[in-house]
Amino acid sequence: MSSFNNIGQAIILCGGKGTRLAPISGNIIPKSLIKIGRYPFIYYLINQIYSLGIKRIILCTGYLSELIYTDLNNFNFRNNNIFEFVFSNEDTPLGTAGALIKAFPLLKNHSSIIFNGDTYIKGNLKSYINKETSSNISMLTSFKYFSKDFGVTYCSKNNLLE
């Protein structure tokens, strides 16, 4: 059973090249650093993580990872002692599962919440996490009537992953 109070760290998957966003990023910045309004997208994720009371963030980086590191330093996230940032950098793209496997040795002995570095979840994450569940892992997805070549999950009528 998961409980929000057991979550001691967040993982942000931000190692992708963002080829679909090349017209916006120009392939010169990682997609998590593309500005939405005044700030890079990753700042909104970090603030959401902060609102959950989580202070340890593992960043699974890859493409242009040094820019993410520098940007977080420049914005003073790393120097204000609010967060402990830990970087797990992929020298070659490993995909989602590969990034998580590479970061596994960095995990401390408590539950984690994983965020995609290009996805913002609007809503009350605390209530979702605290919801009674009989499994050791949960995944929050959204229902769409269309599918793409990426980010698709298939569920049975019982809402179990197929």
At which residue positions do the language-model features occur?
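Glycine-centered loop/turn positions within well-structured domains
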Residues: T19, K31, E66
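Short catalytic helix/loop segments, enriched in acidic residues and glycine
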Residues: N27-Y43
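Conserved beta-strand scaffold positions in the cores of enzyme catalytic domains, especially
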Residues: L33, E84-F87, I137-M139
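Conserved core of the sugar-phosphate nucleotidyltransferase
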Residues: L72, I121-E162
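Alpha-helix termination/capping residues and helix-transition junctions
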Residues: F4, N27, S51, L106-N109, ...
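Active-site metal-binding loops of divalent metal-dependent hydrolases
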Residues: K17, F115-T119, F143
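Conserved N-terminal catalytic core of the sugar/cofactor nucleotidyltransferase
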Residues: S2-I12, Y39-N116, L125-S127
